[in-house]
């Protein structure tokens, strides 16, 4: 009989399997692990609980979390509290989507492939690019993959990246670049934007591309037109990491001449979930189509002339070319991409613009309230839904006290950059009300 209720392998099964591979016991399988680091104590597990008792205990533990359904959140820095239409969970919970993996057999995967195709189409339209892929793991890895593409396309081994890009994305890029022997140089920011004078001096004939965030980590809108001219005059690629919601109002990077646009679609239909999983996107111009990482779904017709969808240009991919592939990403975030697609389709063009406008209006209202109450707000007013406020106490302490008032405070910028100690990055989305914004400003009155 089976040793464990939910593990169907019996003792006889175990014995036969060990005999086939030529070992006497399970312990023999771990002989490569040094004896001194093996765990040999009792697990000291508590007695089993009934399901109702277990649910009560887990609910008690979960209640310690500060969640955005009960707290007013002003935390952003790449992950945001946005409205998720109720239809999103209903659609993505359908079994034909929820269990689907990479649809290699198009004849039995038309629904999944069409959903991915629609995601690609919406991302391409938002970014102003020619095409987009089926998704990436997240915005950070999409950015790193874009840099790898730029290096491979230009045959150059150096990437410049703005210091106003999210610090975690910079770290992901550096990790990718190490294995590919690509040099990464960070161009410092000044007044919350890329230092263009430093960029001009850094551009040379060994630069594959320049990475900029739009809006950037500090919420500021970078001058893409000026950056595009500098980068392309150097025959390098312009790589833009963008918040797709902001593109409901801002001019799309593609219209400025960006070569690659990446980002994270978490803002559409995907909860914060402690930072992931989310959904990266990757959009390019036609000239880079055959070098795009990940899956591409294309529209075609079958032998009867009916419209159909297939995975296309697969010779780029690692399951075909192995070490010669354009990338070693071997999957996508199809379920989360579907969530974003449903959210965007539900909002529609008018709703998406309205959602973006509420982010802009409410964040600028909050900025004005801070200034009226004597707070120092840094940088220009050219921001989308995030801005920086200087306080007189460590942000960690401030945020702990805010929790007692039912508020999740902004991001502690000193975590990554000492010069921004006691500076809070405040995010204001469409979810925040005037009353919540006023209460937030009032709660910080003692630390301005």
UniProtKB/Swiss-Prot annotation:
Enzyme Commission code: 1.4.4.2
Catalysed reactions, semicolon-separated: N(6)-[(R)-lipoyl]-L-lysyl-[glycine-cleavage complex H protein] + glycine + H(+) = N(6)-[(R)-S(8)-aminomethyldihydrolipoyl]-L-lysyl-[glycine-cleavage complex H protein] + CO2
Domain of life of the organism encoding this protein: Bacteria
Enzyme class: oxidoreductase
One Pfam family in the UniProt entry: GDC-P
Keywords tagged on the record: Oxidoreductase
Xref: InterPro entries: GcvPA (IPR023010), GDC-P_N (IPR049315), GDC_P (IPR020581), PyrdxlP-dep_Trfase (IPR015424), PyrdxlP-dep_Trfase_major (IPR015421), PyrdxlP-dep_Trfase_small (IPR015422)
One annotated GO molecular function: glycine dehydrogenase (decarboxylating) activity
GO aspect biological process, one term: glycine decarboxylation via glycine cleavage system
Spans traversing the lipid bilayer: none
Family: Belongs to the GcvP family. N-terminal subunit subfamily.
Function: The glycine cleavage system catalyzes the degradation of glycine. The P protein binds the alpha-amino group of glycine through its pyridoxal phosphate cofactor; CO(2) is released and the remaining methylamine moiety is then transferred to the lipoamide cofactor of the H protein.
Subunit details: The glycine cleavage system is composed of four proteins: P, T, L and H. In this organism, the P 'protein' is a heterodimer of two subunits.
Protein name (database record): Probable glycine dehydrogenase (decarboxylating) subunit 1
Source organism per UniProt: Listeria innocua serovar 6a (strain ATCC BAA-680 / CLIP 11262)
Taxonomic lineage from the root: Bacteria, Bacillati, Bacillota, Bacilli, Bacillales
């Amino acid at each position: 009989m089976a040793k464990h209720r939910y593990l169907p392998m019996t003792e006889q099964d175990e014995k036969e399997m060990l005999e086939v591979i030529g070992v006497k016991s399970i312990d023999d399988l771990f002989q490569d692990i040094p004896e001194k680091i093996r765990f040999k104590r009792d697990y000291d597990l508590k007695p089993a609980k009934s399901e109702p008792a277990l649910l009560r205990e887990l609910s008690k533990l979960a209640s310690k979390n500060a969640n955005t359904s009960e707290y007013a959140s002003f935390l952003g820095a790449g992950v945001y509290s946005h409205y998720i239409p109720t239809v999103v969970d209903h659609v993505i919970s359908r079994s034909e989507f929820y269990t689907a993996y990479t649809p290699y057999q198009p004849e039995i995967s038309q629904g999944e492939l069409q959903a991915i195709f629609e995601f690609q189409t919406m991302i391409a339209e938002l970014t102003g690019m020619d095409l987009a892929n089926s998704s990436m793991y997240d915005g950070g890895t999409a950015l790193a993959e874009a840099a790898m593409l730029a290096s491979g396309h230009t045959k150059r081994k150096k990437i410049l990246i703005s210091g106003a890009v999210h610090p975690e994305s910079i770290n992901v890029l550096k990790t990718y670049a190490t294995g590919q022997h690509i040099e990464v140089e960070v161009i410092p920011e000044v007044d919350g934007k890329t230092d263009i004078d430093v960029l001009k001096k850094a551009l040379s004939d060994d630069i594959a591309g320049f990475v900029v965030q739009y809006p950037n980590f500090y919420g500021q809108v970078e001058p893409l037109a000026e950056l595009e001219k500098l980068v392309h005059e150097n025959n390098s690629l312009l790589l833009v990491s963008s918040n797709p919601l902001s593109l409901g109002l801002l001019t799309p990077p593609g219209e400025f001449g960006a070569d690659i646009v990446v980002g994270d679609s978490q803002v559409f239909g995907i909860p914060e979930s402690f930072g992931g999983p989310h959904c990266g996107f990757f959009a390019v111009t036609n000239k880079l189509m055959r070098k795009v990482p990940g899956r591409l779904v294309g529209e075609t017709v079958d032998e009867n002339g009916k419209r159909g969808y297939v995975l296309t240009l697969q010779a780029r991919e690692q399951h075909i070319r192995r070490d010669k592939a354009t990338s070693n990403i071997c999957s996508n975030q199809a379920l989360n991409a579907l969530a974003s697609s449903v959210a965007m389709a539900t909002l529609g063009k008018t709703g998406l613009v309205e959602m973006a406008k509420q982010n802009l209006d409410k964040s600028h209202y909050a900025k004005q309230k801070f200034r009226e109450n004597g707070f120092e707000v840094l940088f220009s007013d050219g921001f989308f839904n995030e801005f920086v406020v200087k306080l007189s106490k460590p942000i960690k302490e401030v945020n702990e006290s805010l929790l007692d008032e039912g508020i999740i405070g902004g991001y502690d910028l000193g975590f990554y950059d000492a010069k921004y100690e006691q500076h809070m990055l405040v995010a204001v989305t469409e979810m925040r009300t005037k009353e919540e914004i006023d209460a937030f400003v009032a709660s910080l009155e003692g630390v301005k």
